[in-house]
């Protein structure tokens, strides 16, 4: 909901910047909260990764609004959510699949209440295509988070690898989807950013093998 409000207030570009930069929060938590040690090779991978974020987001924003309250909430929200997912993955009292099911049930209830509010208060009409798209995105999101938690469980001692790998993967797949599905125009710097994201994943993977 906050992300949608941010897009409405300041545009998708500034919101996307805030979401991508939220990677800084879980990486910091990996070091101070989860006591992970970073090798020099992994640090280089992080630097290349943040460079990839900069170049892929090197786009003009159509919004002239400078209200950074919502983008800041997006940055903090996504960063904290990543940390919580890591906690859920290694939580021993419940299996992570049970925790994930409860999380999605809670999110579903909140979404239904929000939808009912929009129908009753704002008199918006509920269209079948919106329901179908919502279900499709929900299923994809569930699968995405499920494998995200599995990765955290498999690499419990190296959460930064999962955090960074996920973020770089989103950059690559998001860029490909934009080009192939939505015919989005990318600059040479955007393509360079995608290349850096691939290089970052390779470097971080190599750091795991050493």
PLM ranges: what are they?
Residues 24-43, 170-191:
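C-terminal transmembrane-helix exit sites in multi-pass transporters
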Residues 3-18, 90-98, 148-166:
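Structural motif at transmembrane-helix junctions in multi-pass transporters
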Residues 1, 23-28, 79, 138, ...:
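Hydrophobic/small/kink-forming positions within alpha-helical transmembrane segments
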Residues 1-9, 59-70, 104-156, 179, ...:
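Membrane-interface interhelical linkers
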Residues 34-50, 71-72, 96-109, 157-170:
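Structural signature of hydrophobic alpha-helical transmembrane segments
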Residues 83-106, 126-130, 157-158:
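Juxtamembrane helix-loop-helix junctions in multi-pass membrane proteins
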Residues 62-94, 109, 210:
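Glycine-/small-residue-enriched transmembrane alpha-helix faces in small-molecule transporters
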Residues 29-31, 41-58, 189-208:
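Hydrophobic transmembrane alpha-helices of multi-pass small-molecule transport proteins
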């Amino acid at each position: 909901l906050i992300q949608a409000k941010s897009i409405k207030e300041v545009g998708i570009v500034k919101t996307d910047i805030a979401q991508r930069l939220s990677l800084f929060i879980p990486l910091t938590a990996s070091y101070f909260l989860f006591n992970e040690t970073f090798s020099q090779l992994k640090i280089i991978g992080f630097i290349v990764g943040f460079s990839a974020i900069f170049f892929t987001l090197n786009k003009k924003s159509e919004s002239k609004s400078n209200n950074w309250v919502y983008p800041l909430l997006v940055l903090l929200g996504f960063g904290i959510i990543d940390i919580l997912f890591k906690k859920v993955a290694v939580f021993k009292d419940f299996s992570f699949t049970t925790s994930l099911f409860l999380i999605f049930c809670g999110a579903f209830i909140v979404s239904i209440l929000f939808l009912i509010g929009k129908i009753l208060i704002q008199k918006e009409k509920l269209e079948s295509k919106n329901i179908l798209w919502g279900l499709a995105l929900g299923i994809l999101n569930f699968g995405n988070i499920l494998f995200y938690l599995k990765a955290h469980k498999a690499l419990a001692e190296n959460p930064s690898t999962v955090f960074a790998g996920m973020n770089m993967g989103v950059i690559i797949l998001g860029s490909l989807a934009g080009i192939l599905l939505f015919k989005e125009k990318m600059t040479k710097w955007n393509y360079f950013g995608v290349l850096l994201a691939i290089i970052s994943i390779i470097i971080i993977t190599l750091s795991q093998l050493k």
